[in-house]
Amino acid sequence: MRGRRLSGPMFDAIAPIRMQRSRGAASVRLGPRGIEDLAQSGSAKAMLPRMTAGRPEIVFLNTAGGLASGDRLDYRIELAPRTQALATTQTAERAYRAKDAPAQIRLHLQVGEGGWLDWLPQETILYDGARLGRETAVDLAPGAGCLLLEPIILGRLAMGETIRHLQLTDRRIVRQDGRMIHHDALALDDAALSRLHHPAMLGKARAMASLALIAPHAADLLEPARAVLDEPGVTGAASAPPGRLILRLLADDGWPLRRQVIRLLRVLRPDPLPRIWQV
C-alpha cells in the first residue's frame, strides 16, 4: 500500500521544526594564589589541571563537539595583578556546515597590572559550508602582556575535503590601559575562496596561523623567531611594530603548521608547551 501525504487544517498548521542550538559560557578568575572564581554553563567547561611547576594552565572544552548553525560559545579569563597563566583548548574546535545563522565565539581576556597571559588554543577546523564569527577582546592593564595564537585549517585535509562555501569573520582587538594597540582581522567568504590560489591570497595553503606577542621586549625576539621560520611546507613572515611581534604562517597541511608553531613557541616563551598539546 502506498503511503498517503497527510493534509488538512490540523497538519497544515504544523510549524517547521527548529533545530536546537548549543550555548556555552565559561569564566575563570585567577589571582596570585590560584582560583578566585570559576563559572560554567551549557556546553562550555573550564578545567585547571594540577600543576607542580610553571604557570597555571586553563583548559577550555566545548562538550557539544563542535559548532553548528546558531551555536554560541563565550570564554572569559580574568587575571589579577601580577598573575601569570596559560590558557588553551582541550582539542581542536570544529565549525560544521551551517544552513542559516553563523556560529559565534566570543573571548574576553583581561590581564591585571604586571600580569601575563599565553592564549594558545588548538586549531579551528572549518568544514565546507561553515559559518563562523569570532571576536577576541583583550584588555591589558599597564605593565601587562600577552601572547596570542590563532591557528585555522580549511577543511578536513585527511579526507580530501575541498572548501567551496565558507563565511568566516575573525577579529582580535588588544587594548592597553583603554587604548587600542593591536587590531587583527580576517574575513573569508565564497568570493574570497574563488581567489585563494592568487598569490595575494593564500596560494595553495589550507592551514594558517597568526601569533602576536604584546610586550616591551617583543622586538628583541624578532631575529630569534625569524631564525626558526624554516619548517618544510610552511611559509612564514615576522615583523616587529612598536611593542609587538607579529608572525604569519601558511602551510599546505595542519601538521607542518603545528610543528612550526611549536618551534616558535619554544623561542617566544620560557615555559614548556601546554600539557594537553602532548596528548
UniProtKB/Swiss-Prot annotation:
UniProt KW keywords: Chaperone, Cytoplasm, Nickel insertion
What's one GO MF term for it? nickel cation binding
The entry's cellular-component GO terms read: cytoplasm
Q: Does the keyword Chaperone apply?
A: yes
Question: Secretion signal: which residues?
Answer: none
Q: Which top-level group of life is the source organism from?
A: Bacteria
Answer yes or no on keyword DNA repair. no
Q: Which InterPro entries match?
A: UreD
The subcellular location is: Cytoplasm
Primary location class: cytoplasm
Note the Pfam families from the entry: UreD
What does the subunit section of this Swiss-Prot or TrEMBL entry state?
A: UreD, UreF and UreG form a complex that acts as a GTP-hydrolysis-dependent molecular chaperone, activating the urease apoprotein by helping to assemble the nickel containing metallocenter of UreC. The UreE protein probably delivers the nickel.
**What family does this belong to?**
Belongs to the UreD family.
Function text: Required for maturation of urease via the functional incorporation of the urease nickel metallocenter.
Q: What is this protein called?
A: Urease accessory protein UreD
User: To which species is this protein native?
Assistant: Paracoccus denitrificans (strain Pd 1222)
